[in-house]
Amino acid sequence: MPMQGAQRRLLGSLNSIPTATPNLGLAANHTGAPCLEVSIPDWLFLSLGLVSLVQNVLVVAAIAKNRNLHSPMYCFICCLALSDLLVSGSNMLETAVILMLEAGALATRASVVQQLQNTIDVLTCSSMLCSLCFLGAIALDRYVSIFYALRYHSIVTLPRARRAIAATWVASVLSSTLFIAYCDHAAVLLCLVVFFLAMLVLMAVLYVHMLARACQHAQGITRLHKRQLPAHQGFGLRGAATLTILLGIFFLCWGPFFLHLMLVVLCPQHLTCSCIFKNFKVFLTLIICNTIIDPLIYAFRSQELCRTLKEVLLCSW
């Protein structure tokens, strides 16, 4: 979808609405009714992207450096970091190009801008799909490690993990290319929304089942040592809180973006929906925030990875 004016984002395939005006306040929609419009300054957007970029580069470097981390689980974590890196990097590139075009520092033909837009769209969409896929893969890997502990190393082997990773990247790039090529079709956007909901349900079911098993295990230990029940209840509450935070962050960071896509299909001309469309950059910013949070949840909690990360940082100095 071609750009119309300097205020259009390059990510026009998934958003045909102008970006927010440079303040937080009430803007008028087509009928003059107030419409809340939140602005994300470019410097803040680029800063968050840079933090995400640095974090995820460090995760990839640490896993690549330490052979002890070349297991299927860490391969999935590495690919999650790589896809998050591409999500933040592609959005930073898009913002930088827009700023240069607006400032007149980059002069090029409309056809070149269109090709660049399509390339960034495919890169962004494929990296987002990969990020969601690897979040699901990490949940599935943990599920197998708990419920099939004795057979885990025969089920989740490194060759199988590598084949699954390669298939995920190829499928994401191919599907993203098709999505961008046929972005005007409602079925394409609905497919993306359904995919997000499927990943959300998959993660919720797996993690809830793991929490239930962990509570049963804690209850068994409590009975074995004849300890009081509140200790088990406390464990259950902590586990439920952790699960709520994990799934809550995922839903809060990704949900608004896919809600935007769903509303584009359901009510593209509705006045209330048009107000939501104006905050598209906020939804992208939430996804960037998720790429910052992912390493904190999945990578930096590993002592082995943190030790390797310190070595990487010391070597870089």
UniProtKB/Swiss-Prot annotation:
Gene Ontology cellular-component annotations: plasma membrane
Location of the protein in the cell: Cell membrane
Residues linked to a lipid group, S-palmitoyl cysteine type: C315
Effect caused by changing M100L: In strain: Isolate 3
SMART domains per record: 7TM_GPCR_Srsx
Membrane topology of this protein: Multi-pass membrane protein
Listed InterPro entries: GPCR_Rhodpsn, GPCR_Rhodpsn_7TM, Melcrt_ACTH_rcpt, MSH_rcpt
Glycan-linked positions: N29
Keywords attached to this entry: Cell membrane, G-protein coupled receptor, Glycoprotein, Lipoprotein, Membrane, Palmitate, Receptor, Transducer, Transmembrane, Transmembrane helix
MF GO annotations: melanocyte-stimulating hormone receptor activity
Biological process per Gene Ontology, one example term: adenylate cyclase-activating G protein-coupled receptor signaling pathway
Ranges annotated as spanning the membrane: 38-63, 73-93, 119-140, 164-183, 192-211, 241-266, 280-300
Superkingdom of the organism of origin: Eukaryota
PANTHER family: G-PROTEIN COUPLED RECEPTOR
Family note: Belongs to the G-protein coupled receptor 1 family.
Function of the molecule: Receptor for MSH (alpha, beta and gamma) and ACTH. The activity of this receptor is mediated by G proteins which activate adenylate cyclase. Mediates melanogenesis, the production of eumelanin (black/brown) and phaeomelanin (red/yellow), via regulation of cAMP signaling in melanocytes.
Protein name per the record: Melanocyte-stimulating hormone receptor
